[in-house]
Curated annotation (Swiss-Prot):
Cross-referenced InterPro entries: Band_7 (IPR001107), Band_7/SPFH_dom_sf (IPR036013), Prohibitin (IPR000163)
Cytoplasm recorded as keyword: yes
SUPFAM superfamilies: Band 7/SPFH domain (SSF117892)
Assigned protein family: Belongs to the prohibitin family.
Protein name: Prohibitin 1
CDD domains noted in UniProt: SPFH_prohibitin
Keyword Mitochondrion: yes
Coiled coil (residue ranges): 177-211
Upper classification of the organism: Eukaryota, Metazoa, Chordata, Craniata, Vertebrata
Gene3D superfamilies to which the protein is assigned, alphabetical: Band 7 domain
Function, as annotated: Protein with pleiotropic attributes mediated in a cell-compartment- and tissue-specific manner, which include the plasma membrane-associated cell signaling functions, mitochondrial chaperone, and transcriptional co-regulator of transcription factors in the nucleus.
Organism: Gallus gallus
């Protein structure tokens, strides 16, 4: 009797385990920010896109393919040529995500690794097309315009594959060794030219100052000559007297100086 009871319990437990396994295999979860596409062994990829949450499927017949629909970054380096045939190394940073409604088409025509298959090729295509419109100098001075043109063209191109580009930016832009050396030499030459121009301007200013000073000396000499011609020796004597008075005044301000007037035998001690 007990053996039959245990046998019944065993069968019930086995049946419960099988039923639990079946139920568990019929459930699947779609996490936040993700979507699922159902592949049916008999009908192929279903057009319905499954949202977040827990869902049922037919075990061994249907299979969920989970896609991450959040924006993800990707850096893509590209080597291309400018309008003036200079080698340009560019790195493009892209924030991308799939169009949710087009996930069945993306999975059918491209696959789960759609970003690996699509983004590098279309990025290289667009960058080569846009960069070829500018020469090396314009790529530096008009970088914002280049970035905007690349973003517009690449966004339009990605849309044909069911991708949305939330942001496109140029994060790295360098040129070949020859062009870099040429730019550095040009900058040095410009600095030398500025320095030479400063020296020339300084010399010109000094020359003008010398001319003005010479003209002033010439004018002063002319005035003195005219004064001498008009006043004769009287002007010279007057200047001598003024000079003597100035000397006497300076001597009188000095300590321990004795002044002896002309024509007198008495020494006078000037006040301190």
């Amino acid at each position: 009797m007990a053996a039959k009871v245990f046998e019944s319990i065993g069968k019930f437990g086995l049946g419960l385990a099988v039923a639990g396994g079946v139920v568990n295999s019929a459930l699947y979860n779609v996490d936040a920010g993700h979507r699922a596409v159902i592949f049916d062994r008999f009908r192929g990829v279903q057009d319905t896109v499954v949202g977040e949450g827990t869902h049922f499927l037919i075990p061994w017949v249907q299979k969920p393919i989970i896609f991450d629909c959040r924006s993800r970054p990707r850096n893509i380096p590209v080597i291309t040529g400018s309008k003036d045939l200079q080698n340009v190394n560019i790195t493009l940073r892209i924030l991308f995500r799939p169009v949710t409604a087009q996930l069945p088409r993306i999975f059918t025509s491209i696959g789960e690794d759609y970003d690996e298959r699509v983004l590098p090729s279309i990025t290289t295509e667009i960058l080569k097309s846009v960069v070829a419109r500018f020469d090396a100098g314009e790529l530096i001075t008009q970088r914002e315009l280049v970035s905007r043109q690349v973003s517009e063209d690449l966004t339009e191109r990605a849309a044909t594959f069911g991708l949305i580009l939330d942001d496109v930016s140029l994060t790295h832009l360098t040129f070949g060794k020859e062009f870099t050396e040429a730019v550095e030499m040009k900058q040095v030459a410009q600095q030398e030219a500025e320095r030479a121009r400063f020296i020339v301007e300084k010399a010109e200013q000094q020359k003008k100052a010398a001319v003005i000073s010479a003209e002033g000396d010439s004018k002063a000499a002319e005035l003195i000559a005219n004064s001498l011609a008009t006043a004769g020796d009287g002007l010279i004597e007057l200047r001598k007297l003024e000079a003597a008075e100035d000397i006497a005044y300076q001597l009188s301000r000095s300590r321990n100086i004795t002044y002896l007037p002309s024509g007198q035998s008495v020494l006078l001690q000037l006040p301190q």
